[in-house]
Amino acid sequence: MDQQQQGLDRNTLVGIVLISVIMGVWMIFFAPEPPTPEQRQAIADSLAALQPDSLDQGEPFLVDPAVEGTLAAPTDSAFAAATQGTAETVVVETETYIATLSTKGGTMLNFVLKEYNKAGEEATPVDLVSNTDDGALAVVFTPPSGRIVDSRSLFFQTTASTQDTIRVTDGPQQIAFDAPIGGGALRLAYTFEPEGHGVGFAVEEVNSNLLTRAGGYELLWDGGLPFDELDANDESINAGAYVRAGGEVEQIKLSKEPELNELITGTIEWTAVKNKYFVAAILPGEGLATEGAELDGLRIGEPGEAAFDDYYTTRLLIPRAATGEPNPYTLYLGPVDLSFLDDYDESLYEVVDYGFGAFMTRPLAKYVIAPVFRLFGTFIPSYGVVIILFAILIKILLYPLTKSAYRSTAKMRDLQPEMTALKEKYPDDPQKQQEQMMKLYRDRGVNPLGGCLPLLLQYPIIIALWRFFQNSILIRQESFLWANDLSAPDPVLHLPF
């Protein structure tokens, strides 16, 4: 019995060593390369040029490069007509959301998802734009006067109703905001569809060339997304800012550092900010030139504090704006749900972190686990039952691998007496021992690695399942038996500290 146990311990040790070696080799050869000194200096130079030293809460981002950290209204005569006005709101309602726009800045003040509620507040719907008082969306540029201008500091005009809610039911509806500048106008236009989570957005100069003379502009999403779950620390771990360029996704996460900046150059496919279950993404229109993007992050407070939050900003760098030609974008503002994300860009699901083995686990989750799980959910009313059935299905599918591992372990256990005899026969000749053991394996048809390889093959599937259920909005706020929320931990005892 002791010899059998020693054999089992040896097989277990071999399996652990092999798995550790594979993971170590993967991390060494496939880990992302650190930025070069030249790249770090380029990022620092860009941030020094684009960021103010400080921001006054409640004021728009409008910086005088000569006196960093100060905020003031544009003094250039080209903006005189846009510096005065009254802030009014335009409310737009579709089947899936209610958006509130403002004539102050032509920006978005609220974007309420009608089908989703905040955790612990069933009557309070999720609002993706509540982390900033000035609105999330902004156009920032530097006119010939040299003063950086944020569109949220300007007053816009609109022909849309500011009295009644605009309900979009039959077809797309466009709402345009015009700020009088330079003898013409800066136009920010939104296009709303009756269904879906997408919003069309366009930046256009009308009879003006200030953006062109400024050398382009930045399109900002400011403030990230507010935390909507009970566990703010867990949500911080899953939140971040993202950009996809050259087929690769770059990200920053404040769960690792309290303040982060990253500059990415080249053609940008999309930028995004995310909390655990929701995402706000900006996708440039086809043919629109981009020259890079910047991701900024700042942590406020510490986990456990009431004021704890993570603020992310994405800046899409547009090199020029042709007068009379709108620069088109698509905004995706909704859940991290494959069935919605794929309608806008299949790569948007890459905002979900699947770890260093994502090249294996993400495709498994996206093309196998998610479709099957959603299929079960279409005819089974309880997601708790779906999870149980899904677990049984996975167990059945993995049974051949598990059986193979058990069978190989049993064969190795049966060989233990003969292997012990070989060691006793050649106690001082390890090479002879190894030769005779390999001959014994061949004669008996035993693979010494047969016990750990089947288990190793299951590893990507198990990790994909774990990551999928950890981030799936399908089970968010779904109850089963005594559990009120299948996506949240089930507390057994609340400790007084």
Task: List where the protein language model places each region.
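Coil residues (strongly favoring Ser/Thr
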Residues: S46, S54, S77, D164-T165, ...
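Acidic/proline-rich low-complexity IDRs
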Residues: S46-A49, S54, F61, T70, ...
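Short, Gly/Pro- and small/polar-rich lid/capping loops
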Residues: S54-T89
